[in-house]
Swiss-Prot record:
Known function: Activates the ATG1 kinase in a nutritional condition dependent manner through the TOR pathway, leading to autophagy. Also involved in cytoplasm to vacuole transport (Cvt) and more specifically in Cvt vesicle formation. Seems to play a role in the switching machinery regulating the conversion between the Cvt pathway and autophagy. Finally, ATG13 is also required for glycogen storage during stationary phase.
Gene for this chain: ATG13
PANTHER family found in the cross-reference section: AUTOPHAGY-RELATED PROTEIN 13 (PTHR13430:SF4), PTHR13430
Subunit (UniProt): Interacts with ATG1 to form the ATG1-ATG13 kinase complex.
Name of this protein: Autophagy-related protein 13
Cellular localisation: Cytoplasm; Preautophagosomal structure
Biased composition range(s): Polar residues: 521-533, 545-557
Disulfide bonds: none
InterPro entries linked: ATG13, Atg13_N, HORMA_dom_sf
């Protein structure tokens, strides 16, 4: 069971953490399974005495179910204070966990009597009767260094818990608990409860009836079982139980019990039965067994020839499977006298009878030869002392799965189900290098992994653990000073970009500024003359700085890389306050001023005015008949167009040189009474026609 040779590799830190979680949750889950079968829900709240604490309805309801080892027992959990030793201590120093199941007698009144199989049990000055004790321990002396696969260990523990779940529901104490829960009396005077004890400390029986004390005259009143241990690289996980075989307790009134006992003692037909040795038979089972055994002895005396082949048959077979087999040919008469298949009387079992039950841990750790736990094991020990070999018969009924250990061992298939290992070499924990490596890491989990969510497993804390280690390994972040040196280079690049894209930045500001009632109307005319007209209007309005008309032509961003700035043929119809100029006009005026010198811009504006006047005169000649024949009322916007035209051309004439021939010509035309009025009328007519065309296009758009 233990490997003394040096392992091929040691446990890593991550593997050590997982193994520590498995071992810790093994203790907690085993306690949960036992309490699940022993404590009724709901149960009576017990008041613990000074020595021990009793647990009744002290289970708390958790938010999630503990699904460790593929076993879901509901959302009830044991209080943390009861399992504090096994939650926060070091894995290698975990004490054995003892769970004690007892029958509480504190509810018995003076007129009530406790009876066991129609026999009165003396419970004076006793408050409890111990029914069973479970021992859960982590044995460091037994290990297997070659078992390094933790999923395999986890699956073996799953099988162990299934066996524990089945065994806990088959023991007599569970049947007693089930009977008391299903009884009609809600306020029962007795009930089953559990407590948790530290197995490293002695267990006394002061003020209660211990597990080793007999309540009837039966020879063997206790039994024990051990489950298959699970080996790990640093130790073995073990579960064992010692229990009372008879738990048929019941409560009756004292007067009824005494009257029934008095009537049985004074009936003439009732007589005391004795066996062949003169011992009184108090129970019907003893009387029936005595009759069967006496009949078999009488038959063997009448047939001396068949004495060698005749054997007695008990009513209930007690012992191992080996006891029902035929005797070995080399067995002597003395061996037959002590074997279970050649005697008709029960074999006495020597037990350590003391006034107070000793600690369970030393008893279970004693040598199996010194303290037999069942009849089958005692018979095997007696045969070994006389030189009889029973290994061949025991192997006859061995498991078909073979030995699960690496050492030579034999399995005893007796009734108590003990695991008897012969010729087993034990190694001390000092010979285990993996254990030393595990101890050097000083594993002491402060938070149990059972506190995780419903999908709790051994891989749940890996992310959090790695994150905390990453935080510890990384140095503290140091922020630089408040000097703006970090931002100097990006700011310089941004300024360079802004200079090269000045017009684009202005257009972004134009789109970002809010405008009211802005409607974009695309003109169908794409001639160069209309473009020149719009450019002239933009330049004039930018120079004035204020807008007196509701017409606000807008511009569109120029494409970078073009040889000449092209303006999209569109007119913006909007309303602006007189105090604030049009954003589009101002931006375009700034662009024109930026790209042209003042003398050149003045000359260009004069040229635009001349071409505009030629266009106006030609349009007036072609549309004279249509305008004269039109009887429609004058559009109200005509006055606005007139004022707009006058303001534009007057402001332009003021800015030009007074000595220029074109300017003097314009002044003479404006000062002439007849010619000035005629030209103004032509201009008004042209703008009125443009306004009607724009309104029509606006409706179509």
């Amino acid at each position: 069971m233990s490997s003394a040779r040096r392992p091929s590799k040691l446990l890593s830190e991550k593997q050590s953490d997982k193994l520590a979680q498995i071992i810790q949750n093994f203790f907690l889950k085993a306690a949960h399974v036992i309490f699940h079968f022993r404590v009724a829900f709901p149960s009576v709240v017990l008041q613990p005495d000074d020595s021990y604490g009793a647990m009744g309805d002290t289970f708390s309801q958790s938010k999630y179910n503990n699904r460790w080892f593929n076993l879901d027992l509901g959302n009830y959990e044991i209080p943390r204070t009861e399992l504090s030793l096994w939650r926060n201590k070091d894995i290698l120093s975990l004490p054995p966990l003892v769970l004690e199941t007892f029958l509480d007698l504190r509810g018995l009144s003076s007129n009530q009597t406790l009876m066991l199989d129609d026999v009165i049990v003396k419970t004076s000055k006793k408050s409890e009767i111990v029914l069973e004790r479970w021992l859960i321990e982590f044995d460091l002396s037994t290990f297997d260094n070659e078992v390094m696969e933790f999923p395999s260990i986890y699956k073996k523990i799953i099988i162990l818990f299934r066996s524990l779940y089945l065994l806990a529901g088959l023991l007599p104490s569970y049947r007693l608990r089930d009977k008391l829960v299903k009884s009609k009396s809600k306020n029962s005077a007795i009930h089953v409860s559990c407590r948790i004890l530290d197995g490293s400390k002695p267990i006394t029986s002061k003020g209660r009836i211990g597990l080793s004390k007999k309540l009837l005259s039966e020879e063997e009143h206790t039994s024990s079982k051990k489950l298959q241990p699970v080996l790990t690289p640093i130790g073995a996980l073990r579960v064992s139980v010692s229990y009372r075989t008879n738990c048929n307790f019941q409560v009756s009134d004292t007067e009824e019990a005494l009257s029934s006992q008095f009537m049985l003692d004074h009936l003439p037909s009732v007589r005391t039965n004795y066996d062949s040795d003169g011992n009184s038979l108090t129970s019907p089972m003893d009387y029936l067994q005595n009759r069967v055994s006496s009949a078999s002895i009488h038959w063997s005396d009448q047939s001396p020839r068949r004495r060698s082949s005749t054997r007695s048959v008990q009513l209930f077979k007690v012992g191992s499977i080996n006891s029902s087999s035929s005797p070995p040919p080399g067995a002597t008469q003395s061996n037959q006298s002590v074997s279970s298949f050649s005697t008709s009387k029960p074999i006495p079992v020597t037990l350590n009878k003391t006034n107070s039950s000793a600690s369970l841990v030393p008893i279970l750790r004693q040598n199996k030869d010194s303290l037999p736990k069942s009849i089958g094991s005692m018979v095997q020990n007696q045969m070994q002392e006389t030189g009889h070999q029973v290994s061949s018969n025991s192997r006859r009924f061995s498991s078909s799965f073979g030995s699960r250990f690496r050492t030579v061992s034999s399995r005893n298939n007796s009734l108590d189900g003990q695991l008897v290992v012969a010729n087993q070499p034990f190694s001390t924990p000092s010979n285990n290098p993996i254990l030393h490596n595990f101890r050097s890491r000083n594993k002491s989990p402060s938070v149990s992994s059972t506190e995780l969510g419903p999908s709790s497993s051994i891989y749940m804390d890996d992310d959090l653990d790695s994150f905390m280690k990453m935080l510890d390994s990384k140095p503290d972040l140091r922020f630089p000073s408040n000097s703006p040196s970090v931002y100097e280079d990006p700011l310089a690049n941004f300024k360079t970009f802004q200079k090269s894209n000045d017009f684009l930045a202005l257009e972004q500001q134009q789109h970002g500024s809010p405008t009211s009632n802005q409607i974009m109307i695309h003109s169908q005319s794409q001639t160069s003359q209309s473009q020149v007209f719009k450019r002239t209007v933009f330049s004039d309005r930018s120079r004035r700085g204020s807008v007196s008309s509701n017409y606000s032509p807008s511009s569109q961003a120029l494409r970078p890389g073009a040889s000449a700035p092209m303006v999209t043929p569109s007119v913006t119809y909007g309303k602006f306050h007189a105090s604030s100029g049009s954003p589009s006009n101002s931006s375009l005026a700034q662009y024109l001023r930026h790209n042209s010198s003042p003398p050149a811009s003045a000359t260009a504006v004069a040229t635009v005015h001349n071409s505009l006047r030629r266009l106006t005169s030609s349009s007036q000649r072609t549309n004279t008949n249509s305008t004269n024949s039109s009887t429609r009322p004058v559009n109200p916007e005509l006055l606005k167009l007139k004022s707009f035209n006058e303001d534009v051309f007057e402001s332009d004439d003021d800015e030009h040189d007074e000595h220029s021939p074109r300017s003097t010509d314009t002044k003479s035309r404006n000062t002439g009474p007849s010619s000035g009025h005629a030209e103004d009328d032509e201009d008004d007519l042209l703008f009125a026609m443009s306004d009607m065309t724009l309104a029509k296009n606006n409706q179509e758009f």
